[in-house]
């Protein structure tokens, strides 16, 4: 018996294919609740602990933290639980205090119910950490503060965040631009130190592209 290849019209073929299609929702690794990027946790902690931080920045940080559920180990190593709990107990702002309470309660409940389910932790490699440490040193010298000061850490973490968490050319150029500005613009340096110029706004104004 002869064999024939039957070619359907393009529209008919598309209709048949569509019957077998399935709808998939793409999810990034970071969008999953049990995936915890340590750098993000450290950044939010830095934001919450920096004196004079604008309220909107603190609210945003708490809302982002509420989307994640760090493991007991991450809570201990980063001490983010201590930071949130401190805001829950001692914040003078009712909204911040209430939101911190929600985050703390959410984490505690989730950990108690999922104690045996580990979270996935994403950390920076040693080379990246080394380069970032050098950037912190340059920033600390420019702003005339110790390298472990909360403000220095907050600035560097914001640069890293706005550079898509990559020590790229954009990251290096942004650090250089910030260092130059802090060294040669005394009034700007004072504004950043006093908190009159929020760190995220300061970094964004000097952000360099790749």
From Swiss-Prot:
Keywords: Nucleus
CDD domains in UniProt: TFIIS_I
Cellular component annotations (GO), alphabetically ordered: nucleus
The TFIIS central domain, residue ranges: 131-210
SUPFAM superfamilies per UniProt: Conserved domain common to transcription factors TFIIS, elongin A, CRSP70, Elongation factor TFIIS domain 2
Short name of one Pfam family: Med26
Subcellular localization: Nucleus
Domain TFIIS N-terminal: from-to ranges: 39-114
GO terms under biological process: DNA-templated transcription; regulation of transcription by RNA polymerase II
Major site of localization recorded for this protein: nucleus
InterPro entries cross-referenced by the UniProt entry: TFIIS/CRSP70_N_sub (IPR003617), TFIIS/LEDGF_dom_sf (IPR035441), TFIIS_cen_dom (IPR003618), TFIIS_cen_dom_sf (IPR036575), TFIIS_N (IPR017923)
The keyword Nucleus is annotated on this UniProt entry: yes
Family statement: Belongs to the TCEANC2 family.
The protein's name in its UniProt record: Transcription elongation factor A N-terminal and central domain-containing protein 2
Organism lineage: Eukaryota, Metazoa, Chordata, Craniata, Vertebrata
